[in-house]
């Protein structure tokens, strides 16, 4: 800042600055600038289109969705149709390279920890450049993973709400499909992934 304001600025920031951290404010400034561009608005519109396409694709596999669909970036799927809790579905998908969150449904019989649902969203997929057609494959992979996952048991042989049984073959087949999808939509195409794997992955 200009010298005449320097003392005031330095006393106000960071001397008496509380919750809003400087780097957070800077990040917000950039985010607001980006949000005011046509490219961001096109991305946001595609996020919703992808979410609606994913919702319809999931329903084609008879996966119930809370509210029957979505008009934003996410959806809540009831995974009890597979005989799984939300935690089990989350764990199974994670082992196959899919990130989702266990999420309670209204009046959830499994409670807020184990849950009966999973939350799926499309912002990250859209950032990768995926479109509505790709959402059909995402839904197909989700269905494949969940229908090939069984609830695990405790040491006493009782059903466990958090443990799963999923074969190595299922995981390998799902990961192959996930990798194929990601290979067609590389986030940083300019990076030499083979070099990075060779140098940094042990």
Protein language model features and the residues they cover:
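Active-site C-terminal subdomain of aminotransferase-like
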Residues: 1-85, 166
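Generic non-transmembrane alpha-helical segments
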Residues: 53, 57-61, 88-96, 141-145
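Short, well-ordered loop/turn and helix-capping segments at boundaries between secondary-structure elements
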Residues: 1-2, 30, 34-37, 81, ...
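PLP-dependent enzyme catalytic core of the Aspartate aminotransferase-like
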Residues: 49, 112-202
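Residue-level preference for alpha-helix termini and adjacent loops
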Residues: 8, 12-16, 42, 47, ...
């Amino acid at each position: 800042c200009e010298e005449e304001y320097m003392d005031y600025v330095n006393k106000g920031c960071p001397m008496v600055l509380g919750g809003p951290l400087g780097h957070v404010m800077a990040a917000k400034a950039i985010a607001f600038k980006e949000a005011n561009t046509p490219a961001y608005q096109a991305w946001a519109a595609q996020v919703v289109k992808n979410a609606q396409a994913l919702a319809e694709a999931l329903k084609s596999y008879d996966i119930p969705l809370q509210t029957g669909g979505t008009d934003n970036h996410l959806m809540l799927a009831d995974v009890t149709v597979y005989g799984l809790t939300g935690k089990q579905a989350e764990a199974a998908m994670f082992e196959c390279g899919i990130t989702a969150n266990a999420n309670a449904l209204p009046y959830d019989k499994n409670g807020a920890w184990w849950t009966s649902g999973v939350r799926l969203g499309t912002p990250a997929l859209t950032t990768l450049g995926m479109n509505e057609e790709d959402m059909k494959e995402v839904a197909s992979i989700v269905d494949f993973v969940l229908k090939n996952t069984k609830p695990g048991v405790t040491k006493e042989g009782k059903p466990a709400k958090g443990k799963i049984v999923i074969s190595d073959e299922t995981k390998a087949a799902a990961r192959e499909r996930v990798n194929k999808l990601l290979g067609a939509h590389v986030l940083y195409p300019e990076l030499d992934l083979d070099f990075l794997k060779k140098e940094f992955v042990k």
